[in-house]
């Protein structure tokens, strides 16, 4: 399902929230209806954590995570880190990352299997991403932009990239990620798809300005209409056991 929301007067949902298949993080404060959109779709399925990072509300731009792990910048206080640990499932590894490019959500785009990262991230950061998130890591650009996390939205089912991404680049990225990609926009033509929306395997939340056409592209590429969260959890478990049986 794809739904629209606004954080106060901002349509940049991906700036104020992080969404994965095992938890969601939503900025503290903000309007109740922003939080209630997440609650309506996610309650009883995954925990929703109200948080700040380094005393700011731009949690979606400062963190990067997936079902297995969560990376936060060194500006995260001990208290904030403890709050995240208390709110998020114990199976999720949480790690502070010492990195000059500290807006991790802008420089890392990942799902549960692969991460595309800013070409200039430290080698040590790359190793932490691979270890904590349990993913293969590739240094990449999206439409010649180094901010992979800003210009791409990705789930385990598919992805949307910057509208000016060439067909050749789309094909190359798609074969790295092993999921279908489309070039598209959010919030009535914004190319900053990663900051404009959040998505997991059954839900996308995007800004109020997002058009019906943009929504239908999301529902199609992320395959959001196909099954609900509970069905999807089963699907993932089955998929993993099938994959394991190959080895």
Curated annotation (Swiss-Prot):
GO cellular component, alphabetical, reads: cytoplasm; nucleolus; preribosome, large subunit precursor
Tell me where it mainly resides. Answer: cytoplasm
Keyword Plastid in the entry? The reply is no
Q: Which UniProt keywords apply?
A: Cytoplasm, Initiation factor, Nucleus, Phosphoprotein, Protein biosynthesis, Ribosome biogenesis
Q: Which residues carry this modification: Phosphoserine?
A: 174-175
GO-annotated molecular function:
ribosomal large subunit binding; translation initiation factor activity
Q: Where are the transmembrane segments?
A: none
Where does it reside?
Cytoplasm; Nucleus, Nucleolus
- Reproduce the UniProt comment on modification after translation: Phosphorylation at Ser-174 and Ser-175 promotes nuclear export.
Task: Please provide the Gene Ontology terms (biological process) for this protein.
Answer: assembly of large subunit precursor of preribosome; cytosolic ribosome assembly; maturation of 5.8S rRNA from tricistronic rRNA transcript (SSU-rRNA, 5.8S rRNA, LSU-rRNA); maturation of LSU-rRNA from tricistronic rRNA transcript (SSU-rRNA, 5.8S rRNA, LSU-rRNA); ribosomal subunit export from nucleus
UniProt keyword Cytoplasm, yes or no: yes
The Swiss-Prot or TrEMBL record describes its family as follows: Belongs to the eIF-6 family.
| UniProt subunit comment | Monomer. Associates with the 60S ribosomal subunit.
Would you tell me the protein name for this molecule? Answer: Eukaryotic translation initiation factor 6
State the organism named in the record: Talaromyces stipitatus (strain ATCC 10500 / CBS 375.48 / QM 6759 / NRRL 1006)
Q: Which gene specifies this protein's sequence?
A: tif6
């Amino acid at each position: 399902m794809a739904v629209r929301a606004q954080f106060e007067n901002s349509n940049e949902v991906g700036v104020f929230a992080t969404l994965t298949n095992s938890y969601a993080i939503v900025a503290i404060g903000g309007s109740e209806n922003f939080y209630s959109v997440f609650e309506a779709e996610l309650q009883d399925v995954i925990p929703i954590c109200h948080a700040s990072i380094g005393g700011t509300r731009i949690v979606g731009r400062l963190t990067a995570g997936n079902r297995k792990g969560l990376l936060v910048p060194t500006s995260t206080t001990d208290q904030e880190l403890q709050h995240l640990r208390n709110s998020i499932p114990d199976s999720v590894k949480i790690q502070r990352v010492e990195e000059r490019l500290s807006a991790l959500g802008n420089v890392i785009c990942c799902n549960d299997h692969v991460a595309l990262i800013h070409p200039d991230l430290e080698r040590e950061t790359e190793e932490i991403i691979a270890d904590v998130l349990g993913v293969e890591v590739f240094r990449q650009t999206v439409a010649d932009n180094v901010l992979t996390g800003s210009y791409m939205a990705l789930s385990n089912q598919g992805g949307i990239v910057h509208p000016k991404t060439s067909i050749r680049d789309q094909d190359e990225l798609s074969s790295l990620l092993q999921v279908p990609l489309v070039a598209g926009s959010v919030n009535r033509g914004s190319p900053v798809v990663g900051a404009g929306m959040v998505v997991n395997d059954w839900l996308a939340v995007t800004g109020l300005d997002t058009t019906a056409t943009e929504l239908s592209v999301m529902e199609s590429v992320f395959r959001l209409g196909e099954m609900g969260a509970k069905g999807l959890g089963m699907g993932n478990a089955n998929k993993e056991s099938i994959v394991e049986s190959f080895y």
